[in-house]
């Protein structure tokens, strides 16, 4: 077994989030495009001889117990391995804001699967890890694969698309005092839009095919930026002052191509032709964001999900 393993866990943004309808299992049928960005957490993992799994974190207030996806991922991987004596010391360095619609928790869980599969020498394939990830969270398989992906079903069914012609830049903002409940956001979507949901697999399949064929996606490029549809934004924004303010500030940034909320929010972002343009726009507006109570980051698209570090 390897002595120590370090893994990065990138955040994601939604370039497209379409709620197609309600499934018989209670979940929503989704058609999404997700993109990894270089705002990332880090996991440092080492073996323990006593068979315990212990998690620590540099983020005060974040639970390190068995409700944390890192702990749950570690426990599931050990259970499936059959080697119940395996133990690990895991330290999580948080950079992705919590409860932000950026899949920080899911990315950490995916990174734990990758890290401990390596640390413990288990030899699970990427597909096996993705199957375990899907048991833990709908967006965890994406967080393992990363890059840019079409995501269908609950979000766990991935299809690769051509890599972007260039790495677009991102300015990302979040008010650290505000969070949005994902179940609430989907419940509001059902309440306000449920009468217009598609109702059968034939209709779902047609919308998936429409998204696969979207000109802006083949490949993604600054000359034809994505429309950034987010059906959850339609219901969250009118009821969340933080999202309204974030989008107004982002829309005022010089050179931005498009703005949107990510996932169920409340994080919002603007796209730029490249990282330099994003850096320069944030430099101009950093004080305005701070005065309005927002944390802000400039980021780039990346072509990977959870990744082993040297």
From Swiss-Prot:
SUPFAM superfamilies: GHMP Kinase, C-terminal domain, Ribosomal protein S5 domain 2-like. Gene3D superfamilies: 3.30.230.10, GHMP kinase, C-terminal domain. Its EC number is 2.7.1.148. One of its GO terms (molecular function) is 4-(cytidine 5'-diphospho)-2-C-methyl-D-erythritol kinase activity. ATP binds at residues 97-107. It catalyses: 4-CDP-2-C-methyl-D-erythritol + ATP = 4-CDP-2-C-methyl-D-erythritol 2-phosphate + ADP + H(+). PANTHER family: 4-DIPHOSPHOCYTIDYL-2-C-METHYL-D-ERYTHRITOL KINASE, CHLOROPLASTIC. This is 4-diphosphocytidyl-2-C-methyl-D-erythritol kinase. It comes from Synechococcus sp. (strain CC9311).
